[in-house]
Structure formats: C-alpha cells, structure tokens
C-alpha cells in the first residue's frame, strides 16, 4: 500500500513538472524535415533557404552498427531542423553514390562531413556532431558577420572576450568602401573569428583606433596588433588574418575541434588541460597566459588549451589514452598521428610550475629534447622487461 502511495505521488510530481512551461527541452516529434537532395531538386531547395546544411554520407550499408550510426546522425539533424524550424535554414542528405555528380559539382570530397551553403560560400563544419553544438554554430552563422560597437558598455563586453581571435575597425559609416571591404573579409571567417566595427569617435578613442584602422587581437593577449598599411582591401585583410590564424595560446572548442586538432606544428601539439572553473585549473591557465604573452613572437609556439568541462564525453578516453588524471592540471606534447604523448611532471596541485619552469619545459619540447619518441623507447623497454620476466619464469618452471 505504501509503495502504491509513493508511486501515485511520483506520477503526480512528474505530471506537475511537465505541466510547468519555460523549460521544455526539445525531443524529436517524428516529423521528417531533413530531405534527400538530388540534382533534380537542388535549385528549388537552395532558393528556399538562407542557409542550407548538407550531410554528405556514404551509401547506407547492411551492417547493423553502421546503420545505427547513420540513424543517430539523422536524428541529430532532424532535432536541429526542428529546433531551427522558424529560421530560414534547410537540412538535406546527399548520398555519395547516388548523387556523385552533384557532390562533385559542389566540391564535396569527404564522406561523413556536414557542409553549409551560405550565398556563394561553402563552410565545412569540423566540430562535434551534437545537436546543441550545431544549433549554436548555425545561429552564429546567420548573424551579421560584423558586430557594431557604439557604447562604453559594449566596449567593456568586447574587452572581456579573451579566448577568441577578434578584429575591430573604425570607419566613417556603414557605407564606407573600407567598411565594406572589412565586412566582406569577415564573411571568410564567420563564425570562427569575431569581427567588430565602430563608427563612433568616442569608442574609437577609447580603443586607440584611427580612421580606417583595424586592430587584430590574438587570444589572451593584452595588446592588439595594428594591421599595417591602412586602408585595406578585402584581400589584404584576409591574407593578414590567415597569416596570424594560429595563436600562441588557443582554446579547443566543440564547434571546430577537428580543424584545430589537424592544425598541428610538425605533427605535434603542446596540449594543456585545465578546468577554468577549478581554482587550480584557473591558476594554471593564468600561468599559461603569462607564458604565451612572453613568447607571442615565437612562430614555433602554439599551446592548445583544453577545458575538460567542454568535452565530458572525451574525459575518460583522454585519461586512458594519455595515462593522465584530468582532475588535475596537465601539460604535455602529443603526437597527432598515433596519440603518443609525454607529460610534464607536476607533483601535486599545490606545486604548480612557475612561468619560468614552464618556459624551460616548452623550450626542451621545441628543441626536440623532450619528444614522444622517447615515450616509445620507454614502452619498448617495458615490453622487453616483461618478456625477460616471462622467460625467467619459464626457466624456473623447467627447473622444477
């Protein structure tokens, strides 16, 4: 009787919770919004939307695991399409075999990739294939490529953005030819790099900007770089950004994680794990920032900061692969080909390395004194030692 009473109370509580409005997380409603794209319907579909997301996939095989993986991605796309139904964003599937001609025409060459068509641009999504990540990415993509700053409060908000590459320019008006060039350059990098502009003399004075000048801010740096030789063409701005696109310290983000990981230096990444919300992680991150600021002119140095809180599904994998504890700050060098790694010895959270000690360790990495090949040698030694132990035990058994 007591159990029955508790069950009824439980159902009532759940029903009451479901009756509340304002926190209804979306669940797939079963309606098909993702359509198959073909040469026949391509132009019609393209005209219908401001953005078109195309999932380019290999033919669905008879393998059950492969079928389930495909269905999971299809459900993710259906949920994203449902959430963004009020936006002018379309979602389609492109079969690599059935629509090979269309895929070639669109320049698709990597099966399993998600491409977004916006105007005459094709953007490849190189991030985590998750509904929340995709929704945020697409919402950023439909925004204007340049955000206008016109007040002191907006300047403060701009200054607090420290973990993105950002640019800001001062122009006479939105009709200025130099602003138009800046806006067109911004479209090349949206939504990964943040572009801002102001037409306000007071804002420009506070940011020490001259007319038609653009400042480039590297992540976590105190001072910007004034792009030389103003005023600029679109091509000059694009070229400058591409040359400075790999910061000294950068954050791994779910929406561009694969592209960032592929942007290695000589096959390696210097990787730092630190939880920003944790006191020790925050302290370690501040040390990393200091090292980056002191070495920002070194083209061979790029540190990849990963906050484990951003990737909860990868924590166990990283701990197993790298043999480290991610509840503590860590820094190491990782071979991107085989995931071999060597990690700096940090005795405990209360004894974090100083900026000078970290710089010395990084210098050893860049010089090759510390490298992942040493880790391979140690593993081989361990294997040989195990084999010798096994041989000794076999000899003992024979003697008996």
From Swiss-Prot:
The modification Phosphotyrosine is found at residue 282. GO terms for biological process: regulation of cardiac muscle contraction by regulation of the release of sequestered calcium ion. It comes from the Eukaryota. Residues 373-400 have a biased composition (Acidic residues). PROSITE patterns: CALSEQUESTRIN_1, CALSEQUESTRIN_2. One of its GO terms (molecular function) is calcium ion binding. Keywords: Calcium, Glycoprotein, Metal-binding, Muscle protein, Phosphoprotein, Sarcoplasmic reticulum, Signal. Gene3D superfamilies: Glutaredoxin. CDD domains: PDI_b'_Calsequestrin_C (cd03074), PDI_b_Calsequestrin_middle (cd03066), PDI_b_Calsequestrin_N (cd03065). Glycans are attached at residue 335. Residues 365-400 are annotated as: Disordered. It is found in: Sarcoplasmic reticulum lumen. Residues 1-19 form the signal peptide. Phosphorylation in the C-terminus, probably by CK2, moderately increases calcium buffering capacity. N-glycosylated. Calsequestrin is a high-capacity, moderate affinity, calcium-binding protein and thus acts as an internal calcium store in muscle. Calcium ions are bound by clusters of acidic residues at the protein surface, especially at the interface between subunits. Can bind around 60 Ca(2+) ions. Regulates the release of lumenal Ca(2+) via the calcium release channel RYR2; this plays an important role in triggering muscle contraction. Plays a role in excitation-contraction coupling in the heart and in regulating the rate of heart beats. Belongs to the calsequestrin family. This is Calsequestrin-2. It comes from Pongo abelii.
């Amino acid at each position: 009787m007591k159990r029955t009473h508790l069950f009824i109370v439980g159902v009532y509580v759940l029903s009451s919770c479901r009756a509340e409005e304002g926190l209804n997380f979306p669940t797939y409603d079963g309606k098909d919004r993702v359509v198959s794209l073909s040469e026949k319907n391509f132009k019609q579909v393209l005209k219908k939307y401001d953005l078109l997301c195309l999932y380019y996939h290999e033919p669905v095989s008879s393998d059950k695991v492969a079928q389930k993986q495909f269905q999971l991605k299809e459900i993710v796309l259906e949920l994203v399409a449902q959430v963004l139904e009020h936006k002018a964003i379309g979602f389609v599937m492109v079969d690599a075999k059935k629509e090979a001609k269309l895929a070639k025409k669109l320049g698709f060459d990597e099966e399993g990739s998600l491409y977004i068509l916006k105007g005459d641009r094709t953007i490849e999504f190189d991030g985590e294939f998750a509904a929340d990540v995709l929704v945020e990415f697409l919402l950023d993509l439909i925004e204007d490529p340049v955000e206008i700053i016109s007040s002191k409060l907006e300047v403060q908000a701009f200054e607090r953005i420290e973990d993105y590459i950002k640019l800001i320019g001062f122009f006479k008006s939105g009709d200025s030819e130099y602003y138009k060039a800046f806006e067109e350059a911004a479209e090349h990098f949206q939504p990964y790099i943040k572009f801002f502009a102001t037409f306000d003399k007071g804002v420009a004075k506070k940011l020490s900007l001259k007319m038609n000048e653009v400042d480039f801010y590297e992540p976590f740096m105190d001072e910007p770089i004034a792009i030389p030789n103003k005023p600029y063409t679109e091509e000059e701005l694009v070229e400058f950004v591409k040359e400075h696109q790999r910061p000294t310290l950068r954050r791994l983000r779910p929406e561009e994680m694969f592209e960032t990981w592929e942007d290695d230096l000589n096959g390696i990444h210097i990787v730092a794990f630190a939880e920003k919300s944790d006191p020790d992680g925050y302290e370690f991150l501040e040390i990393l920032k200091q090292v980056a600021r002191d070495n920002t002119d070194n083209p061979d140095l790029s540190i990849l900061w990963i906050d484990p809180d951003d990737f909860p599904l990868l924590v166990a994998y990283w701990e197993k692969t790298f043999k480290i504890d991610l509840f503590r700050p860590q820094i190491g060098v990782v071979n991107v080909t085989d995931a071999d790694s060597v990690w700096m010895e940090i005795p405990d959270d209360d004894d974090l390395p100083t900026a000078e000690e970290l710089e010395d360790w990084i210098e050893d990495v860049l010089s090759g004194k510390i490298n992942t090949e040493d880790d391979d040698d140690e593993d081989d030694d361990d294997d040989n030692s195990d084999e010798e132990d096994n041989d000794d035990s076999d000899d003992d058994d024979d003697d008996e």
